[in-house]
Curated annotation (Swiss-Prot):
Biological source species: Alder yellows phytoplasma
Protein name: Small ribosomal subunit protein uS3
InterPro entries per record: KH_dom-like_a/b (IPR015946), KH_dom_type_2 (IPR004044), KH_sf_prok-type (IPR009019), Ribosomal_S3_C_sf (IPR036419), Ribosomal_uS3_bac-typ (IPR005704), Ribosomal_uS3_C (IPR001351), Ribosomal_uS3_CS (IPR018280)
Protein role: Binds the lower part of the 30S subunit head. Binds mRNA in the 70S ribosome, positioning it for translation.
Gene giving rise to this polypeptide: rpsC
One GO-annotated biological process of the protein: translation
Length: 250
């Protein structure tokens, strides 16, 4: 029986890069991977859902001391930083106590929240936990994503949908979502919604289009988004005020 691979992992080294960027002796690798997992878990538990979209960890060495640089991509900078950077400094202290190493955190703002699979999946999970009807939630998420200029989206939800006694699977898709095309910029995320009648699984797959030759994912997305905005502006209807309109006479 065939098994589906993770679209993000399938594209590593082809059009995607790793979220942990470091190298070391083979003996230390398992320990450092476990350390990265602890850091990511601490950061995710420290902030509410639908806040952080990506965590990148870089390990550097300065004067024989290991130095960790963490890049946080978020749609809510105010929550991450807090008043006078209190939340950020508190997070740095927690991580330094956990791993006993110096840490620096860089925060980057993400604006197009409806185009990022992680944030879309987390938003759906939050609404399901608030007892919203799942079909309305999925349709709303798809409409918002399509308006932001993506090529296609697919959302899969499993569990006791609507409180039914028997668990089942439902999915909605719009546009083109080519999972096996390696040059396609596919963004994938999975999230769990803990409801009163059980755990629901939410999978979101978003297609941003094919990555152009000799271009990075970020460059390609910027090109496609600018093309979409230009097309959107050109398709706007021009209304004429009939009262003040006068025909030109030759």
């Amino acid at each position: 029986m065939g098994q589906k691979s993770n679209p993000n992992g399938l594209r590593l080294g082809i059009i995607r890069t790793w979220e942990s960027k470091w190298y070391d002796v083979d003996k230390k690798v398992p320990f450092l991977v476990g350390e990265d997992f602890k850091i990511r878990t601490l950061i995710k538990n420290n902030y509410p859902k639908s806040t952080i979209s990506q965590i990148e960890i870089k390990r550097l060495k300065k004067s024989n001391d290991e130095f960790i640089e963490i890049d946080l991509y978020t749609s809510k900078i105010g929550i991450i930083q807090g008043p006078e950077n209190k939340n950020k400094n508190s997070l740095i202290n927690k991580i330094e106590k956990l791993i006993n190493k110096k840490v620096q955190i860089n925060i980057f703002e993400v604006k197009a929240i409806n185009k990022i699979a992680v944030l879309v999946a987390q938003n759906i999970a939050i609404q399901l936990q608030q007892r919203a009807f799942y079909k309305a939630v999925l349709k709303s998420a798809i409409q918002k994503a399509l308006k932001s200029g993506i090529k296609g989206i697919k959302i899969i939800i499993t569990g006791r949908l609507g409180g039914a006694e028997k668990a089942r699977r439902d999915s909605i898709s719009m546009g083109v979502v080519p999972l096996n095309t390696l040059r396609a910029d596919i963004d994938y995320a999975f999230e769990e919604a803990h409801t009163t009648y059980g755990v629901l699984g939410v999978k979101v797959i978003i297609n941003h289009g094919e990555v152009l030759p000799n271009k990075t994912i970020a460059d390609t997305r910027q090109i496609f988004s600018s093309q979409y905005e230009n097309k959107k502006n050109n398709n706007k209807r021009h209304f004429v005020d009939k009262k003040n309109f006068k025909k030109s006479t030759s």
